[in-house]
């Protein structure tokens, strides 16, 4: 007697359901894909008991004839493809012909459908995959599918479902992603007979406000790039909107909701140091590519895809995201306590909860614009305060305006500080100086923050993280270019390492040389410092090197960093000016100029904000002027 037997369809369907129907959200996803493929422009989702008791999807799509309705619940029956070659030109979301058979086999399943030409609709009712009732029914054009008592006949699967809150969240995320991917469709959702949302207008930004709170869309960066191979459109979130949940990253490839590790990693790397450790940015991106260049038949759940040339896609995708980020001003605005917070978006303990962004839809200013805003803030209107130049020792090297590709005019003016601004008499009309002869006004607050008057209000800079950003980019560039910029010490300094310090020293020795450290072995875990980078303060050579090694080890144990990136971060953190250090006026100006010459002036290498702005409009509102 043969030991191998063909499984009955009902058993095969239950096994298949283990892959296709993992939880109530899986049912919702499969049914929504069918509704969209049917051409619906109105879809309603209703659930009870987080989908365990009921899932109902109502659409106004094409509907089905009787023979199609009976076939659609059969395994491997589909209208989407007829041959294997159709997979190379697939335009529909569904194609496997497994979903309804799998769902009906583990639930009490009801299907009601009517086509536009039919006067009477059809009702089919299944229990455990077996048809138990067929009847006519009145109803609107389209299809309604009700799934009751999911996994009622598979107790082991039902037992492993999570709490109602967890299952509800999974369902809501699925529906939300489809509502964002298909703005041309009117969506309505109910949970336990309570309406959760109803979105009609085909506006993605408006829908983002519905799901994430008012003014959320104002913090989006819009991008649109395309070539003959790939089209990329959508929205990027500003760094202060970063989250720990990757659920708030939406990738739609040919309008299909997908998860793709390469795309997620490329976005994360493009944001780079703008992100705090273990945070992810909000993104909503539509990628359009020739269907023959992707494989959607990776898993029965159809959430994963493969690109035929993933490297080529990444080489196009990453620069687009990086360029969009670099072209926008990421300095947050201070907001009064009266202003609304995006509490639904931001983590409760986030350091960025005090920050929000200006309501400037469809437009953001560039780094160069902010620098010019800072330069033009030197001039008060209608009157200009008397200012005088101050010349003191420089901690930061000054650069000519030609050194700043994004920095605007690179003017050099003077300022005596806060007391001179308050006490100086106003200029007469005939002695008002040329605005280009006046330096922007800068004050140091508590030897920690730099306050600058800008044309549109006020800018506050954290002096430590600003200098850290400057030093970090210099260090990265010097190491990558392999042109050490070292200043020799008149009296070499001896350093005796502990065993663990010497081990790390050996690991980074070559890159220390690239950075500008001229170090000579002296035997028995001892070295002589004969030269250091020009940014190292005299007298601090030994301390800086030891602190760098300690910082490097700490970063290596907590973060997954490239060796040079780790070294640059360690160097900049330990060598930057500290909070509490008094700066001269020239040092403050030079620091700001150098900051705006960097590629990413809005965050330090560890992701903390460098610049905060307070606009005149916000000040006027705080003082009741508006």
Swiss-Prot record:
Annotated S-S bridges: none
SUPFAM superfamilies cross-referenced by the UniProt entry: ATPase domain of HSP90 chaperone/DNA topoisomerase II/histidine kinase, DNA mismatch repair protein MutL, Ribosomal protein S5 domain 2-like
Protein role: This protein is involved in the repair of mismatches in DNA. It is required for dam-dependent methyl-directed DNA mismatch repair. May act as a 'molecular matchmaker', a protein that promotes the formation of a stable complex between two or more DNA-binding proteins in an ATP-dependent manner without itself being part of a final effector complex.
Species name: Pelodictyon phaeoclathratiforme (strain DSM 5477 / BU-1)
Annotated PANTHER family: DNA MISMATCH REPAIR PROTEIN MLH, PMS, MUTL (PTHR10073), DNA MISMATCH REPAIR PROTEIN MLH1 (PTHR10073:SF12)
Xref: PROSITE patterns: DNA_MISMATCH_REPAIR_1
Lineage, highest ranks first: Bacteria, Pseudomonadati, Chlorobiota, Chlorobiia, Chlorobiales
InterPro entries cross-referenced by the UniProt entry: DNA_mismatch_repair_CS, DNA_mismatch_repair_MutL, DNA_mismatch_S5_2-like, HATPase_C_sf, MutL/Mlh/PMS, MutL/Mlh/Pms-like, MutL_C, MutL_C_dimsub
An example Gene Ontology CC term for this record: mismatch repair complex
Family in the record: Belongs to the DNA mismatch repair MutL/HexB family.
SMART domains to which the protein is assigned, alphabetical: DNA_mis_repair, MutL_C
Record key words, sorted: DNA damage, DNA repair
Gene Ontology molecular function terms on file: ATP binding; ATP hydrolysis activity; ATP-dependent DNA damage sensor activity; mismatched DNA binding
Protein name: DNA mismatch repair protein MutL
Entry's Gene Ontology BP terms: mismatch repair
């Amino acid at each position: 007697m043969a030991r191998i037997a063909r499984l009955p369809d009902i058993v095969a369907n239950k096994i298949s359901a283990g892959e296709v129907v993992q939880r109530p959200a899986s049912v919702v996803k499969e049914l929504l894909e069918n509704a969209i493929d049917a051409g619906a422009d109105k879809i309603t989702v209703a659930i009870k008991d987080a989908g365990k008791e009921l899932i109902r999807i109502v659409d106004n799509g094409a509907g089905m004839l009787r023979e199609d309705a009976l076939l659609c619940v059969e395994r491997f029956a589909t209208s989407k493809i007829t041959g294997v070659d159709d997979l190379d030109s697939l335009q529909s979301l569904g194609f496997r012909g497994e979903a309804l058979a799998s769902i009906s086999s583990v639930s009490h399943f009801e299907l009601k459908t009517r086509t536009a030409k039919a006067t009477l609709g059809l009702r089919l009712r299944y229990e455990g995959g077996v048809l138990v009732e067929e009847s006519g029914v009145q109803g609107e054009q389209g299809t309604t599918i009700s799934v009751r008592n999911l996994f009622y006949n598979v107790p082991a699967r039902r037992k492993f479902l999570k709490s109602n809150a967890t299952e509800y969240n999974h369902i809501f995320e699925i529906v939300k992603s489809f509502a964002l991917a298909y703005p041309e469709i009117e969506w309505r959702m109910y949970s336990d007979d309570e309406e959760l949302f109803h979105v009609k207008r085909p506006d993605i930004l408006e829908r983002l406000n519905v799901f994430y709170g008012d003014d959320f869309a104002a913090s989006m960066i819009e991008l649109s790039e395309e070539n003959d191979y790939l089209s990329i459109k959508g929205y990027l979130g500003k760094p202060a909107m970063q989250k720990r949940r990757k659920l708030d990253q939406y990738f739609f490839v040919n309008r299909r909701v997908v998860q793709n590790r390469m795309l997620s990693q490329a976005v994360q790397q493009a944001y780079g140091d703008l992100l705090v450790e273990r945070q992810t940015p909000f993104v909503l991106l539509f990628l359009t590519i020739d269907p023959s260049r992707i494989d959607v038949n990776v898993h029965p759940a159809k959430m994963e895809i493969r690109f035929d040339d993933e490297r080529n896609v990444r080489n196009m995708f990453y620069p687009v995201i990086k360029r969009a980020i670099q072209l926008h001003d990421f300095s947050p605005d201070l907001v009064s306590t009266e202003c609304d917070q995006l509490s639904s978006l931001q983590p409760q303990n986030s350091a960025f909860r005090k920050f929000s962004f200006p309501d400037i839809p469809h437009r953001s200013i560039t780094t160069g614009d902010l620098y010019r805003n800072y330069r033009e803030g030197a001039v008060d209107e209608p009157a200009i305060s008397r200012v005088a130049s101050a010349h003191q020792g420089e901690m930061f090297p000054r650069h000519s305006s030609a050194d700043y590709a994004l920095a605007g005019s690179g003017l050099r003016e003077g300022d005596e500080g806060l007391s001179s601004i308050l006490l100086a008499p106003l200029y007469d009309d005939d002695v008002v100086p040329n605005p280009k002869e006046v330096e922007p006004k800068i004050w140091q607050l508590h030897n920690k923050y730099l306050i600058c008057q800008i044309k549109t209000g006020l800018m506050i800079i954290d002096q430590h993280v600003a200098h850290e950003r400057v030093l970090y980019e210099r260090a990265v560039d010097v190491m990558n270019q392999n042109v050490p910029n070292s200043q020799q010490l008149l009296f070499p300094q001896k350093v005796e390492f502990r065993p663990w310090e010497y081990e790390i020293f050996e690991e980074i020795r070559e890159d220390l040389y690239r950075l500008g450290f001229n170090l000579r072995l002296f035997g028995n875990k001892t070295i002589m410092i004969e030269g250091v980078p020009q940014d190292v303060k005299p007298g601090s050579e030994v301390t800086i090197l030891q602190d760098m090694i300690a910082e490097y080890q700490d970063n290596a144990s907590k973060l997954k960093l490239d060796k040079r990136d780790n070294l640059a971060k360690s160097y900049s953190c330990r060598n930057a000016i500290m909070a509490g250090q008094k700066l001269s006026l020239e040092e403050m100006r030079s620091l700001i100029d150098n900051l705006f010459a960097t590629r990413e002036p809005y965050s330090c290498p560890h992701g903390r904000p460098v610049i905060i702005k307070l606009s005149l409009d916000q000040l006027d509102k705080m003082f009741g002027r508006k």
